[in-house]
Regions:
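One-carbon transfer enzymes
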Residues: 3-226
Length: 226
């Protein structure tokens, strides 16, 4: 009789554990996207979520450090909660980051995506969210990256150097600008008639908008599986 009760206890324990695992797998990883400008990469993430490319996570918050950023309109159209955090109003980098942390914690955010976020985050911040912050950079790191390399300047440098191939990289963020572990890269060939502007648009379309959603899904899926 005791053996029967023992088997029953084991059976119930297995059922409970499986139920916990199913609930964990069903729960989406909560994503925050930090922006500063037009939000084209944010839109790529929203589109990917709508198409089911990003299925392990959900964009739950958009934070901008620029009050007039069009990315905020994109968030509004997609019914995603948003907030504006202005460093000049808070007075210091520390206060600026504390406010961002407050918003992230309030929304129970799991991972952070920097999508054209034009502000360097401190070592304290990046360590707090170690392996939880993703950034997309418009070159094949380690080329044309680090301090001073952002936006159109990256593509100007690639053309000035005369390289034949460029691309984009998604990487984890640490205290070194563009120095974190690489998650995914995609190459784009440079044309003879390219200008910085045409190259920027093609790198966005052929690389950034492809590998950023794919990387976000990869990280979310891995986080859910833990």
């Amino acid at each position: 009789m005791r053996y029967i009760f023992f088997l029953l206890d084991v059976f119930i324990a297995v059922i409970i554990e499986n139920a916990k695992r199913r609930r964990k797998m069903a729960k989406s990883v909560k994503i925050a996207v930090l922006v500063s400008g037009g939000g084209t990469n944010l839109q790529a993430l929203i589109n990917a979520q709508n198409k089911g490319i990003i299925k392990s996570g959900k964009i739950s918050l958009v934070i901008s450090n620029v009050a007039t950023a069009y990315a905020l309109k994109r968030a509004e159209k997609a019914n995603i909660p948003s907030a504006v955090v202005l460093k000049k109003e808070l007075g210091s980098q520390e206060a600026f980051e504390e406010k961002i942390v407050e918003l992230l914690e309030k929304s129970n955010i799991d991972i952070i995506v920097l999508a054209g976020f034009m502000s360097i985050l401190s070592e304290n911040f990046t360590r707090r969210y170690d392996k939880r912050i993703l950034n997309v950079h418009p070159s094949l790191i380690p080329s044309f990256c680090g301090k001073g390399f952002y936006g159109l300047r990256v593509h100007e440098a690639a053309l000035e150097k005369g390289v034949k191939v460029t691309g984009a990289t998604v990487h984890f963020v640490n205290e070194i600008p563009d120095g974190g572990e690489i998650i995914m890269q995609k190459a784009v060939y440079i044309r003879e008639d390219d200008t910085p502007e045409t190259l920027q648009k093609r790198v966005m379309k052929l690389a950034e908008w492809k590998i950023l959603p794919a990387s976000v899904e990869k990280v979310c899926a891995e986080r859910k599986a833990k």
